[in-house]
A protein has these predicted regions:
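Short, Lys/Arg-enriched N-terminal segment that forms or immediately precedes the first helix
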Residues: 9-23
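N-terminal leader segment of winged-helix/HTH proteins
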Residues: 1-10
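Hydrophobic, proline/glycine-rich low-complexity stretches
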Residues: 11-12, 29, 33-35
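Intrinsic-disorder/low-complexity regions
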Residues: 1-2, 32, 95
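Winged helix-turn-helix DNA-binding recognition segment
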Residues: 19-29, 37-94
Length: 96
């Protein structure tokens, strides 16, 4: 099932599945999931480097958290190529 986030009537809320808190993930991975969900809920885009800039964790820490989410099935990563031939990753949050 693909992830769908819906906002309540107040746009300052992000809704995440309660299962994320019971999935046995690290606090880092859960926090990353919530940060990504917040950006996606308002229609934004985000990268690992932007997540690292937003938080005290470095890029290596962010990437390890993303790998943890991916391994647990909460995140799907696919590679894309832009019109200049550069590769980039696209992340999709999942509901488990």
């Amino acid at each position: 099932m693909n992830n769908t986030f819906e906002n309540g009537t107040d746009k300052d809320f992000t809704i995440v599945p309660n299962q994320i808190f019971k999935a046995g993930l690290s606090i880092k991975a859960v926090g990353l999931y919530m940060c990504i969900a917040e950006v996606l809920a308002r229609g934004g885009r985000i990268s690992a480097s932007v997540l690292a800039d937003m938080n005290k964790d470095g890029i290596a820490s962010i990437e390890s958290g993303l790998r943890e989410l991916e391994a647990a099935g909460w995140l799907r990563r696919s590679k894309k190529k832009d019109n200049k031939g550069h590769f980039y990753s696209v992340y999709e949050l999942r509901n488990n």
